[in-house]
């Protein structure tokens, strides 16, 4: 589970998640000479604190939290950070491989001057050769593209019927809920439609939202609108994307959109943003895709909208009570598409996120972080 106590005076990096073992940084001579590596598999909060107590003599200068971070033990809370065994004296930073940072007591980290870094690849990192800019946004956008296509064309539902029937004619007729020849465009009282020329509203236009917009515009031929608290003039001018302010005025504009993609972060302000009032203003037959956080959707209101036809398709990569997936969502395979929070789950992102996290540690410990902390430092 863990290494033995330190026998050298080198600063220690605690890994609570497995890094990419082939990482160039991890395996570099400079990294190995500079740091001692300590590994621990999280189990319970009490076991973790006991582990830290046994390693109080180690100079833990950084924690590599990877993707799962401290979710298994209830997050990085004040009670952990201010526990007598927590290495506040030497700990300079905690690094994540994910964009999200739910479950962190940011105020307490700030109080004790412990930096938290998340994954960002929107600017170059000179310590990494061949960094792929916007990789995570690109890969999450692929997920959005699939869910949007599912909404318009229902390919997975047709695939299911094809496997069940073993006959192309029967599969199409079963989808149409009629006997005789079926062209394939009918699904009961719904139709498979082309996304070309349809209007899509993207809620949030950060690095992920922008990549979603590019793929939907240039890949599917959709007309892009975006909604946030302030206009991105560069995108509005260069790409002719139409801006809408994220406030009460958005309700009167929702009727025009065939699809809405949520890429907003989970905050108190965005919780249940997609509620009954929001959906009542939407065009019947809406395709709704959520890549942000599960709690942005009021699940009861969304479920009711699926029943009434206000929503024709719901695509989810994040869920309200994650890791659990609501039974109603799972069982409605004709009206929903679901992926298990894997929008960014590619080999490319896994490897690059590790390199970026390790270079953050190198920069912070060496005192060089100030030049680039504006694009990946949380606190």
From Swiss-Prot:
PROSITE patterns: D_2_HYDROXYACID_DH_3 (PS00671). It holds the Pfam family 2-Hacid_dh_C. One of its GO terms (molecular function) is NAD binding. CDD domains: Mand_dh_like. The keyword DNA repair does not apply. NAD(+) binds at residues 207-208, 291-293, 317, 341-344. The active site is at 293, 322, 341 (proton donor). It comes from the Eukaryota. Its EC number is 1.-.-.-. Keywords: NAD, Oxidoreductase. It is an enzyme of class 1 (oxidoreductase). One of its GO terms (cellular component) is cytoplasm. Gene3D superfamilies: NAD(P)-binding Rossmann-like Domain. Belongs to the D-isomer specific 2-hydroxyacid dehydrogenase family. PANTHER family: 2-HYDROXYACID DEHYDROGENASE YGL185C-RELATED (PTHR10996:SF178), 2-HYDROXYACID DEHYDROGENASE-RELATED (PTHR10996). Present with 1430 molecules/cell in log phase SD medium. This is Putative 2-hydroxyacid dehydrogenase YGL185C. It comes from Saccharomyces cerevisiae (strain ATCC 204508 / S288c) (Baker's yeast).
């Amino acid at each position: 589970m863990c290494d033995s106590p330190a026998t050298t005076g080198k600063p220690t990096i605690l890994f609570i998640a497995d890094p990419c073992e082939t990482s160039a940084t991890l395996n570099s001579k400079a990294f190995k000479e500079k740091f001692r590596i300590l590994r621990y598999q999280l189990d319970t909060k009490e076991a973790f604190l006991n582990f830290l107590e046994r390693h109080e003599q180690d100079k833990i200068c950084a924690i590599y939290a990877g993707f799962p971070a401290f979710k298994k033990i209830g997050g990085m809370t004040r009670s952990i950070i201010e526990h007598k065994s927590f290495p506040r004296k030497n700990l300079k930073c905690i690094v994540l491989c994910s964009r999200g940072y739910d479950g962190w007591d940011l105020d307490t980290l700030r109080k004790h001057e412990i930096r938290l870094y998340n994954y960002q690849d929107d600017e170059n990192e000179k310590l990494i050769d061949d960094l792929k800019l916007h990789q995570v946004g690109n890969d999450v956008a692929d997920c959005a593209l699939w869910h949007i296509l599912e909404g318009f064309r229902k390919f997975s539902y047709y695939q299911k019927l094809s496997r069940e029937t073993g006959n192309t004619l029967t599969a199409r007729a079963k989808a149409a809920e009629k006997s005789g020849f079926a062209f394939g465009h009918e699904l009961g009282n719904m139709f498979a439609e082309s996304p070309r020329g349809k209007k899509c509203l993207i809620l949030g236009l950060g690095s992920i939202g922008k990549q979603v917009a590019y793929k939907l515009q240039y890949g599917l031929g959709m007309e892009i609108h975006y909604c946030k608290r302030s206009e991105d003039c560069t995108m509005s001018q260069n790409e002719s994307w139409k801006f809408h302010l994220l406030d009460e005025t958005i309700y009167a504009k929702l009727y025009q959109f065939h699809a809405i993609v949520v890429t907003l972060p989970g905050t108190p302000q965005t919780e249940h943003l997609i509620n009954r009032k929001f959906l009542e203003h939407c065009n019947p037959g809406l395709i709704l895709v959520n890549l942000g956080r599960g709690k942005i959707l009021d699940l009861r209101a969304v479920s009711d909208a699926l029943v009434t036809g206000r929503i024709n398709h719901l695509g989810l990569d994040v869920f309200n009570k994650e890791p659990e997936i609501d039974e109603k969502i799972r069982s409605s395979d004709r009206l929903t598409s679901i992926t298990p929070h894997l929008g960014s789950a590619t080999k490319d992102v896994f490897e690059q996120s590790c390199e970026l996290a390790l270079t953050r540690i190198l920069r912070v410990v060496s005192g060089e972080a100030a030049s680039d902390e504006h694009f990946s430092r949380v606190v």
